[in-house]
């Protein structure tokens, strides 16, 4: 319960009983006194009471004395009646009728109402007066105020306790995170697990509020946890299975012919020992006897193949070319640079 809500409730509780008491003490125009015009009534009241024309207002617990004074030589017998129509006898106690006096001892809230005095001789006359009692004992406003104060006290204690618990938890969590950043090695992983136990899972509004407070350090801690998870070694069985699958894919991998040329262009320069060359298909077939055996394959559609060759020095290349010309009567190539194997060609098979 918020403070301004509690104050508003206290204000309402204070004003409602005041309005009820004003309703009780308001004069009623409907209660008109009826009396004989030949008699002038008068009432004598005790201290602490208030007298109006036909309404008497007294506080609860006070004593009141009503006297009916008539301008006649002799009084006849006076009878008093309450608002319920019951005649009040002069037997003492709370209601005391003495001559023309009505004494009420310790007025209660239930005594409010219309009181009538009647005189039967020498002439019949009557007079009515309304008695109003101000309610002072057992006030409901006090009850509501006590209930409101108790509820406010309980709410305040719960809020203060919750704030203290959250503050303590935040201080401990921040201290653990700072220690985590200062540790290194295997101890850091142990600190990480300790912090993970302290950080709650966001499942309600309270834990969401806690997460907002520690959002920055929690995210920073999560990044460290990810790095540590990458450094944790996998089980040997998983590692062997992964290596086996990688070797299997390497064995059955088939290169796409359309992407072969692009990959060769992007490949870095070959070292001086070996390389892969693509032979140009526009270049004519050799005049070797082995080549004459499959002349019909010239009309077939060309395909690209990867040929792995070894690169020799220039002197070795010239000697090899001379020996091959003497033995096989090969025609020398038009481009001398092709003998060194420094360019790429395509061949049709």
From Swiss-Prot:
UniProt xrefs under InterPro entries: Ig-like_dom, Ig-like_dom_sf, Ig-like_fold, Ig_sub, Ig_sub2
Residue stretches of biased makeup (Polar residues): 311-331
GO CC field: plasma membrane
Glycosylation sites: 31, 36, 63, 103
Extracellular side: 22-139
Cytoplasmic face of the membrane: 161-349
Stretch forming the signal peptide: 1-21
Transmembrane segments: 140-160
Positions of disulphide bridges: 68-117
PTM comment: Glycosylated.
Function: Component of the elastin-associated microfibrils.
Protein name per Swiss-Prot or TrEMBL: Microfibril-associated glycoprotein 3
High-level lineage: Eukaryota, Metazoa, Chordata, Craniata, Vertebrata
Name of the gene: Mfap3
